Amino acid sequence: SIQFPLLVKNLNIRNSNLVYEEDLPNGNKPGKLTFSQFNLNAQNLNSNKGFKNTVVQIKIHTHFMNVAPMKVNWSFDTANLQDNFTISGQINDLPAESINAFVTPYSHKKVEGNIHEVRFNFKGNRTEISGNYTMKHENVKVKVLDEKTKKEKKVLSAVTNLIVRTNSKSETENVVVHTTRNPTKSFFNLLWKGVEEGLKKTLVGKNVEKTEKTVKQVKQKLGLQDSVNQKEKPKKEKGFFKNLFKK
């Protein structure tokens, strides 16, 4: 059995595989983040009470989504009542398609293209995360999928890609990230939300909410037009309307 107070001065995990997944409320297949060739070194793992130095330092080297080299530096203080932490990292040579295993189940979108480099430097606590995010990318495009059929909505995809910055500038643009934690979710969900917001701001501009509102309005208009078109056809052939689509 584990005895307290607990202190592990040095912990190494080598050449392991780590999978993080979140269940969907509708019971569908969960999205997954995978980390292969996972190597971790943690120093000063402690249970807080009885120790002067309570800061934990963790270094990670792995392959994100099994393909992209990734390194992370993470530190936190077990004595801090707000669960303050800092975390920074870098991902290189990431095919955008590889993140669809996690993105698609939640957003009904697919991404394609090349993400050459991602850098993030965040700090946070039990309620929020914030910091800087930079990314170099090329030929990135988004496919919007129908929630039921999973087929691409080509018109909506085309509208979305008018907004997406397909290629990064010659000098990598830095965006500032700030997002809050879902209290029912883990630290890793909060970290992903920070990375996700950085991804959005890089691809569609810093005013993400305004851009998403614009796309939503276009989607509603397209949905209305589809509904009208479907109504007009029965009217001509049968002389009555049927509302086939719900929005």
Please describe what each predicted stretch is.
Residues E21, A68, E97, E128, ...:
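Residue-level signal for secondary-structure boundary sites
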